[in-house]
From Swiss-Prot:
InterPro entries attached to this UniProt entry: Aldolase_TIM, Elp3/MiaA/NifB-like_rSAM, LIAS_N, Lipoyl_synth, rSAM
Organism: Mycobacterium leprae (strain TN)
Principal location class: cytoplasm
UniProt name for this protein: Lipoyl synthase
This protein's GO CC annotations: cytoplasm
S-S bonds: none
Cofactor(s) recorded in Swiss-Prot or TrEMBL: [4Fe-4S] cluster
Amino acid sequence: MTVAPEDCRLLRLEVRNAQTPIERKPPWIKTRARMGPEYTALKNLVRRVALHTVCEEAGCPNIFECWEDREATFLIGGDQCTRRCDFCQIDTGKPAALDRDEPRRVAESVQTMGLRYTTVTGVARDDLPDGGAWLYATTVRAIKELNPSTGVELLIPDFNGQPARLAEVFDSRPQVLAHNVETVPRIFKRIRPAFTYQRSLDVLTAAREAGLVTKSNLILGLGETADEVRTALADLRKTGCDIVTITQYLRPSMRHHPVERWVRPEEFVEYTQYAEGLGFSGVLGGPLVRSSYRAGRLYEQAAGTRTVGTSVSR
């Protein structure tokens, strides 16, 4: 059997990554389990009716706080992604056939859990003619129809920057349209070979021009410098991006990119203050922050200070 050149390259990359042992976490990379009444009730419900959330399946350290706020995240499109990012724990491979009933099931899960706010994310589906745009848009509409008071945040891939695909997704009108840049230009191709930095910025610009509240994320500890982080934050703000989260990279396995550096908590404070100075409406940074952490609160904060459609000077 002939192995495709791209597959060979990825195998070599994973072999090289595996030469570096899993890094020992510093003392500030820890969280306390605070199991309040809302979390406990939701946990029991999820077990009783066999629901599946990214929060549990990814072992998110913030699940206690988010579930206490009645917020949860769902992954759509299957468990195989057509792209490979060197920080992501989702497997790369040939996805299963499109499940057209998935939007209904997600909407019913949101209803059953009584969520106030939900984040929907998914895998890249370059195998589909529309890149999965129908699935993302239909899931948002299904949630809104069944749960009119629930806020919906949609975290999307770039759909190869195709305007028609993006328009279909934007027309579903999520409360927040998120697309994560994740890292800085110098190492972008190494970390996210199937994406481009500028195209990701263009997706955010297009979403902002469509009148949506927009959001992105930067992962630190992949080899970036402080100046590069500040430049990337400025680039995001120039697109009109409203909300940004700044996070620490936690290596999923030895196959993934090694942790280059553990960013100290005080550095996150400095980056957060810098981002606020740039004019982001909502900023959250920290070693255990994830892009969907406190998503509902960040949206409310941004919506309260932002005028939809306002242009940002470039």
